[in-house]
Amino acid sequence: MEPTGNPANPGLTPSGHVDTFARDHLPPRERWPVLVHDRPELHYPDRLNCGAELLDRSAERFGAERPAFHAPSGETWTYGTLREHVDRIAHVLTGELGVRPGQRVLLRGPTTPWLAACWLAVMKAGAVAVTVLAQQRSQELATMCEIAEVRHALCDIRSVDDLIKAGVPGLSVTTYGGEGPDDLLARAARHPGRYEAVDTAADDVALIAFTSGTTGRPKGCMHFHRDVLAIADTFARHILKPVPDDVFAGSPPLGFTFGLGGLVIFPLRFGASSVLLEQAGPKQLLPAIGRYGITVLFTAPTAYRTMLDQLDAHDVSSLRRCVSAGENLPAATWQAWHQRTGHRVINGIGATELLHIFISAADDAIRPGTTGRPVPGWHARVVDDSGAPVPDGEPGLLAVRGPVGCRYLADDRQLQYVRHGWNVTGDTYVRDPDGYFRYVARADDMIISAGYNVAGPEVEEALLRHPDVAETAVVGRPDELRGQIVVAYVVPREGARPDADRLREFVKGELVPYKCPREIVFLDALPRTATGKLQRFRLRTQPPQEPGP
């Protein structure tokens, strides 16, 4: 097959795509970060289809009879069953729907084995998966479809209304989980259970993952087939160290790269299985651990803290790895979980732009209060605004590079994220002299009050040490005299009635006085995205309130 001939990106392997939109809209090569493949496990062949690697090769290596996915219905799909379903769906995509290699296919629905099968089918068909969340609304969906020029969608029948409401011109929507001969699953049943994966290049785009877009137009992050394997061959291989008998589960949805990696890519890469829960809050996760013998758990810090109050009624003895990401893991939460369960929570920082976690630590290498060290295969440093490294112990911007990098789809914000060959994530960090990286705040979340720098997460950590506090978020509010003042929003623990003045006195006993919140506001819940990330910007825009009781 001939190369696409995109002059902005010479040196790419000849593409397996017929529709070259994704490759044609990669940033010019000079705007890419430096990509590093300095470990043997990251040396991939030029021709690579990640769907075939994750499914076909794993079935051959570990056995088609091994379990792959478990569903709350009690049904278990083996690798062989999964392969048959995936291959039949791939036949529908290419034989009935006319999907050509390189075309974008939007995937939408709650976390189920069928959604995972659709993703794998898109991979094997050589198309590009556009992963979205079941909770995203019509306007968001319309914008994403416009950016990625989506013309095909596979959608759970329960999640189709907002997609139809989006009114995307020329969009062909095929639903699954319904009734009738036109349902995807009915169509798939009429096709053979074997499909030869399209001969894609390792550097063909496999998926477009959109950032949340909470502060502006969503950014589409384009990732290659080799990138999908690279996150498994770095974080999963070296930090999680999976074995075929592992059972993965977690709260992040498959439309979120944290969930796609933790619940589909990682277990399939290593012959393990995963429990795909449609409802995966703390109340559902805890009983599922004992029921399925879950060994590897992925969820957010807030969930770990919430589960602490319910642990006594559940058996969590099967757990081997507990992973936290999505937001900073407070040391108080880490200590409380460790004391109750004996498990050391694996902290980590990842990004949609880099697909998954790139700084972390496990077992005896964990240091509570730090994120960890660069995962093998990744490199990180702390820099100033000019890109120059800052001395250990001084705060600066986190800069990262490794086998995966930021490549926005036709978006000038590429110039902000990639600087001097490094991915600059927008997080403020300190590197300790022993090489551990310590989170300070999002760069735009630093509070400057009367000339003092205050990191909101540090104040949050102090508040979380108070027994009456379940959750908290600390932001800066504009103030004529001080520039900004520190404001804390607090969700009380169930049954508690904390007093604002006493909380302030408690914080003064933990931190220097200028970091103490001048206002404390009590809320029933903090604003979060569909993936559970805290939306601090919504708190910053709230009008001043009377201090809490």
Q: What do these predicted ranges mean?
A:
Residues 373-377, 388-420, 434, 452-454:
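Conserved ATP/PPi-binding loop(s) of AMP-dependent carboxylate-activating enzymes
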Residues 65, 175, 180, 190-210, ...:
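Conserved pre-ATP/AMP-binding loop-to-beta segment of ANL
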Residues 294-299, 308-367, 379:
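Gly/Ser/Thr-rich phosphate-binding loop
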Residues 78-80, 199, 206-230:
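Conserved AMP-binding A3 loop
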Residues 75, 92-136, 253, 453:
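Conserved AMP-binding/adenylate-forming
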Residues 1-21, 95, 120, 124-187, ...:
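Structural core segment of the AMP-binding/adenylate-forming
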Residues 126, 229-247, 254-296, 310:
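Conserved AMP-binding/adenylation subdomain of ANL enzymes
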Residues 136-139, 153-156, 297, 400-402, ...:
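AMP-binding/adenylate-forming catalytic core of the ANL superfamily
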